[in-house]
Amino acid sequence: MENETELRVVHQEEQQREEGEDESQPQNPPPALRRRFVIYLYVGYFLARWSARTWEFSVALYMIHLWPNSLLLAAIYGAIESGSTAIFGPIVGQWVEGMDYVKVLRLWLLFQNLSYTIAGGAVIKLLLVSDLKSRNLPVFAILIVLTNLAGAIGVLSTLAGTILIERDWAVVMSEGHPPAVLTKMNSVIRGIDLSSKLLSPVITGLIISFVSLKASAITFAAWATITAWVEYWLFISVYSGVPAITRSNERRILRSRTKQVEGRDAPVSVSIVPGTEEGYTGNPPSRTGILVILDRMSKSSFVGAWRIYFNQEVVLPGVSLALLFFTVLSFGTLMTATLQWEGIPTYIIGIGRGISATVGLAATLVYPLMQSRLSTLRTGLWSFWSQWSCLLVCVGSIWVKKDKIASYMLMAGVAASRLGLWMFDLAVIQQMQDLVSESDRCVVGGVQNSLQSALDLMAYLLGIIVSNPKDFWILTLISFSTVSLAGMLYTIHLYRIRNHIFHLEKIPLLNKCIFKLLPSRGNV
């Protein structure tokens, strides 16, 4: 009986091995077929990212137009968007992981494009009735709230699509192929996103400058409505045409069902702490209610994650990077709205944003060269202070009398600083990859993203407090001070690791001056 069982097991293993070999041999589909589905993926992702990047740029212009002398509406929208991402971002990731691909596709594209269409429609109504705020303030407020909520839902839906395509499908489609295939797909997908970030503001700015603001809102709403169907057809074609995605979908459905069964069958834990047994009605003699709550909070996974983060060697670089999110010195909602208020043409703002994105893209080429010569730690130092030096131009623009020149100085300083900013970002990320243990890497990454989103939210809250565009100089000084604090923290970290900051002896001119000033030992 045992021999028969062993023979049956061996036979099953041989069948599985043969099936695996059969699957591995013809894994690569015909080049034309695979190329077609990869192109479908790229085109669908481009359409989705174009909608997201267009709304990201346009919403600031709409808000400053609706409330011309205040950054209040733009700051409120930015705060709602950042807050929703910070709070619901992890939930979106769990939701994407727990559903099958078809449901994720349908919900992602439905909510993203529907919410953007609703937001665009609300903006159109607000722009068509220019005096709605004075004529009917409740309706004006309802449309503003609708725009904010729809925009936040659109951003969360976009996050779901980004996780699905960038973190899942690209990996699944490249399974069984050389690593260069995944590298190429990642590069193309990142290039699509950066191209959308580069070009959509330019196109939108041209429409606003040479047609009208209303035309841009109508174009955006129509684009979101039409492309929803095209995106769904492209992505569902990829899902149906790539067997690896179908097999991955079956595995994730099985994992989801297994987790549900394990959750139902999990044993009920019984507390062994005196005074907490079921049916016990008395109060513990030595522990008050507040102490019990504090004890539970200290043992929660949330507090545990932060404890792990602050115990890392790279906590100072992580905090330094997060502090850079507490700024208005970027082509974000607040600065874009301020430039619009200053009278800078919209297409110029779009071009400036495009130049900024191009400079940031160059950082991915310069960083490997510097890192190979200076090490990751020192590359972070040099890149950070190069960014800080460029931001001095933004600070100097505060004392320039002519508003247009000051605005162009602000844009130039921000655009130039992107090279150092993104190089510093890459340096900190690489330090976390190298120095954080594998068991803590996801926890540290999650806390880092949470900290960055929280500081980004604080920047928008600051914009709500200082909402007059005339007072943007206050936000500029606060942002520059925060950046300076981040630089000091990173410099302290480097000094703590290396016991020095610069190699003065490696600077020939400085070395000669020092030796000329100091007396020789023979003369002493």
UniProtKB/Swiss-Prot annotation:
Record's function text: May be involved in iron transport and iron homeostasis.
Family according to the record: Belongs to the ferroportin (FP) (TC 2.A.100) family. SLC40A subfamily.
Mode of membrane association: Multi-pass membrane protein
Keyword Transferase belongs to the record: no
Keywords, comma-separated and alphabetical: Ion transport, Membrane, Transmembrane, Transmembrane helix, Transport
Pfam families noted in UniProt: FPN1
Molecular function GO labels: iron ion transmembrane transporter activity
Positions with biased composition (Basic and acidic residues): 1-18
Gene3D superfamilies tied to this protein: MFS general substrate transporter like domains (1.20.1250.20)
Broad class of the protein's primary localization: membrane
Gene Ontology biological process terms, A to Z: cobalt ion transport
Membrane-spanning residues: 70-92, 109-129, 137-157, 191-211, 218-238, 314-334, 347-367, 380-400, 409-429, 446-466, 472-492
Name of the featured protein: Solute carrier family 40 member 1
Cell location: Membrane
